[in-house]
């Protein structure tokens, strides 16, 4: 059973729509504080308005930023000037930033985007001290952690498992555990697109300790950092 969930917003382009989404998540988290942890959805391209919205969300209980969707939000992950205010605040508040990852190969699907492992790595290089969660296994960036320089720069990077069922064979859990370890993997679903039980079923070959790390220990550690 899922006792508590992190609820993310979408990568919105319209700030008024983002506010509606953020308000909904914040409201529900106050009604069900033992069940919901809200994140705040912004677009750094909004400049000061983005920062004002982020600061408001943090005051009202948001515990992270995301999901950012670089393709849909026309966000250049190498534009440090645009990204730095958000990342500086996130770093000072010790909150994670969640970014959509896109596989550079394979089938197309709605929302896939073009935030490839290369773009995500460039972003991480700019902000290595930030806590960063790469959605959908970072589009495969975790496989490059076999390279020493990628592993070193990705010390504060986590990979979430959202939509695993649509992207990879279940054995990715075992392979990812061997590559980066269960302490760098965070349980995600993209619910209701994929159910939590379906993802959990695909983790059955892992040890109970690894499953505990992925499902709750890692995020607990992030929030207590």
Give short role names for the model-derived ranges.
Residues 1-4, 52, 174-175, 179-186, ...:
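Mid-to-C-terminal alpha-helical segments outside catalytic/metal-binding sites
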Residues 3-4, 12-105:
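Active-site gating/metal-coordination segments in enzymes
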Residues 6-9, 41, 133-136, 160-162, ...:
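Short beta-strand segments
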Residues 19-23, 117, 144, 197:
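Short, surface-exposed alpha-helical segments at coil->helix boundaries
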Residues 25, 57, 65, 90, ...:
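Conserved, mostly hydrophobic/aromatic
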Residues 29-33, 58, 124-125, 150-151, ...:
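N-terminal cationic-hydrophobic initiation segments that often serve targeting/anchoring roles
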Residues 42, 46, 165, 191-192:
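Structured beta->alpha junctions
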Residues 63-64, 69, 77-186:
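Catalytic pocket-lining loop regions of alpha/beta-barrel enzymes
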């Amino acid at each position: 059973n899922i006792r508590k969930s992190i609820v993310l917003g979408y990568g919105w382009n319209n700030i008024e729509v983002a506010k509606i989404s953020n308000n909904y998540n914040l409201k529900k988290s106050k009604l069900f504080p033992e069940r919901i942890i809200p994140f705040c959805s912004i677009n750094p391209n909004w400049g000061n308005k983005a920062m004002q919205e982020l600061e408001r969300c943090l005051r009202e209980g948001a515990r992270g930023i995301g999901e950012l969707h670089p393709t849909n939000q026309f966000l250049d992950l190498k534009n440090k000037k645009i990204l730095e205010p958000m990342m500086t605040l996130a770093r000072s508040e010790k909150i994670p930033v969640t970014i959509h990852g896109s596989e550079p190969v394979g089938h197309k699907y709605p929302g896939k985007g073009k935030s490839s492992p290369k773009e995500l790595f460039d972003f991480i290089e700019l902000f290595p001290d930030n806590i960063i969660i790469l959605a959908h296994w970072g589009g495969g960036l975790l496989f490059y952690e076999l390279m020493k320089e990628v592993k070193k720069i990705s010390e504060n990077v986590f990979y979430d498992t959202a939509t695993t069922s649509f992207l990879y064979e279940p054995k990715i859990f075992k392979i990812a555990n061997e590559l980066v370890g269960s302490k760098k993997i965070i349980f995600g679903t993209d619910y209701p697109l994929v159910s939590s039980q379906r993802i959990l079923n695909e983790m059955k070959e892992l040890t109970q300790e690894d499953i505990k790390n992925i499902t709750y220990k890692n995020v607990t550690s992030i929030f207590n950092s």
